[in-house]
């Protein structure tokens, strides 16, 4: 549905430089946008695209001067404002409440009347599903597990027994909450010979409010106690969270990262793609870990680290620069060695 530009500017709390009655039909990138579209410009590297855009309006920072032929909406954070308008134009459609034919609810489970269970969804004995939560086909809520209100469990999500999921949580397809932790004790005298004796994993996973978990991500239950993902944390696809890990509020963990058992990830931490964190250490609040880093020791609050093993980022940059010069340095060393050998021969015994 088209909306007036003035309404959109008010929605994001922006200052409009342009016609408030102009109709906007959608949003698009600077290069793809055309008449009737809104785009955003928040990074100087896209200046060329901004100057050439055919968008009717652009969300910009407070210091961007007026532009002829394009309405501007000045805001503190153009990217955030763009996200808010995307949500306004593309609000998710929630299926009508109710348990569809083909869904299964155990007689001792509790499903709120406003919840949605699509065909193939299951809620086991003692499971609880909150108001306005949607379970897509194949989603499973195990025995005594709890899923709060306004959650979305996409196809084939598993929330295993006794695990707790808070409110407004999104679990993307095939994610698993509460699989057994990877815990074994070596027994040299097993019945059939030496064995890895399975340690019972009797704890749970607790996911707090406003968490989003990407597709095919696994969060293992604690051996005892809880594995915790804090409020507002966001986990990308293909992330592994091991038993008894604690992920702090508002942390971001990118694809293919793994956090080993009993490690603690603080508040507002960023783990970039393919980061590995060893067990029983702490990554401090607001720390950032560069892609493919291996974190083997505690990281202080606020520190940026990179590399494997991870070291302070500037130190890693210097080491990387030196590594790039290694071939030339080796040539120089060999040349110096030959020169020394020649001088020693000329000098004689």
From Swiss-Prot:
GO terms for biological process: lipid A biosynthetic process. It catalyses: a UDP-3-O-[(3R)-3-hydroxyacyl]-alpha-D-glucosamine + a (3R)-hydroxyacyl-[ACP] = a UDP-2-N,3-O-bis[(3R)-3-hydroxyacyl]-alpha-D-glucosamine + holo-[ACP] + H(+). The keyword Repressor does not apply. One of its GO terms (molecular function) is N-acyltransferase activity. Its EC number is 2.3.1.191. It is an enzyme of class 2 (transferase). Pathway: Bacterial outer membrane biogenesis; LPS lipid A biosynthesis. Signal peptide: none annotated. Pfam families: Hexapep, LpxD. The active site is at 243 (proton acceptor). Coiled coil: none annotated. Keywords: Acyltransferase, Lipid A biosynthesis, Lipid biosynthesis, Lipid metabolism, Repeat, Transferase. GO terms for cellular component: membrane. It comes from the Bacteria. Catalyzes the N-acylation of UDP-3-O-acylglucosamine using 3-hydroxyacyl-ACP as the acyl donor. Is involved in the biosynthesis of lipid A, a phosphorylated glycolipid that anchors the lipopolysaccharide to the outer membrane of the cell. Belongs to the transferase hexapeptide repeat family. LpxD subfamily. PANTHER family: UDP-3-O-ACYLGLUCOSAMINE N-ACYLTRANSFERASE, UDP-3-O-ACYLGLUCOSAMINE N-ACYLTRANSFERASE 1, MITOCHONDRIAL-RELATED. Homotrimer. NCBIfam families: lipid_A_lpxD, PRK00892.1. This is UDP-3-O-acylglucosamine N-acyltransferase. The lineage of its organism: Bacteria, Pseudomonadati, Myxococcota, Myxococcia, Myxococcales.
